[in-house]
Every structure is written in C-alpha cells, then in structure tokens.
C-alpha cells in the first residue's frame, strides 16, 4: 500500500513537470515560455466555438429550420467577432508599442494573421453547408434561384419590377474628384461598379442595396416558393442607373467596421449619460473598416 501511494504521489507531483518540459504544442495551444501551462489563444478558441455552431447547421439530426438558424447565428457571431475582437487587434496594431497576448505570447499581428487563415477555412466550409441546406429546402418547396435559371419572360417580368418598385428608391453614386467616396455603413450591402466613360476614363460607381421599401427576398410570380435576392436584381439591371457609362465590372460588397471604441475620449462632464452614449454610438458607427 505504501509503495502504491508513493507511486501515486510521484505521478501527482512530478508528472506535470515532465509534461511541461516535453509538451511544446497541443492542438491550437501554444506554450508560453513564461507560463506553467499550455493555453489556446482566446480568439482561436472563440473561432472553434463558432465552428461548432456552424457544424450544427450541417448536423442531419437537427431539424432543417433549426439548422438554418444555426447558420444565421454563425454569420452574426462572425460579424460581431470582427467588429469587436479583430477591431481591438487592429487598434493595437496601429499603436507603436508591440502588444502581445499574455497567455500564448502571440502579437496582435500574429493573431490577426492566424485568425484570417482560420476564417478563410470556415467560409469555405460555410459555403458548402449553405449549398447543402439550399438543396434540402427544395423538396420543401423553397428555392433561391439566379438569373441564369430564369426564362426570358420571367427576366422581363423582373425588369418591370425593378423599374417600378426598386429603381425609384435607389441612390446611384459616382466616385470622382468632385465626388469623394461616400461613407459605407456597417454591415450594409452595396453594388460596386467599374465604369468607363465615353472618353475611355475609368470611374467607380456605388449603389446602396438596402431599402426599407422593397424586400430582400422577392418571389418569382410564375414560380411559387422560388425567390431571388433583391441585390442580384439590382446588379443585373444596374446599367439602367448609369446610361452614360459602360459597365466593365460589377460586384456586391459588404463592409464590417471596427466597433472597439475608447469611451474615455468621448467623456464630457457637461453631458449626461444618455447624451454620452449617443455620442459613443455615432462615433462607433464611423470607425475604420476591418473587413470587406
């Protein structure tokens, strides 16, 4: 019994020291030279959590409607992550002082680089799961389609819908010397165009795609349960908004802005708490972009 207890005591007190010397890396964990334990970086740990949320969207044992909800939660989480956590790291990178995370010793630059690599992998996975979900929605009578799958008659019908119900509420803009780049709101969709003038000069056009008047999902009248995105309709007929230009390239863009704001710089003794929070929100909505 005494010998057995001695062995247990040895394992309890000495084995961690042996493991400490031999353990260099475990999964995503990185050994900090000044630490007694092996840690996983906070940001990478959070991305692993969000990946588990995404995995639920692909889990066949979960009801389809809930899987769609999980996919939506994943995207919302990722937006908030970039706004707050990546925004904080971007702010640290802009400072002259080199700031390192105290658990793993990773600098702000190293964390951002690792985060972007992981997010690219997650976005590929998300696209695959999205296609899977869309395929499973078809037997339920719901389908998201694009212009390539529409007949000529249906395309003409959507063009009429664009002329009457979408175009009147759009505000097309052109970036030029006399017209600097407009402010792009956080998490909003924009149609971005490379335009060519009659003299051969290149200009950039921007069309905000969000509007409270028309819906984002528009049902095809001849196909009940078949929908098309309003931004795709805008992008398809956007040349009608720029009749004097030739459109060379076009795409949909979405900006995610930094939401990491220091309240001390906005504090004013003459303002009450409500006014101070209003100023904070206004300033927060106009911080620099962290993702496009």
Predicted regions, residues:
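Short, Lys/Arg-enriched N-terminal segments with co-localized hydrophobic residues
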Residues: 11-30
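Extended, highly charged clamp/arch subdomains and adjacent linkers
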Residues: 34-39, 44-66, 77-292
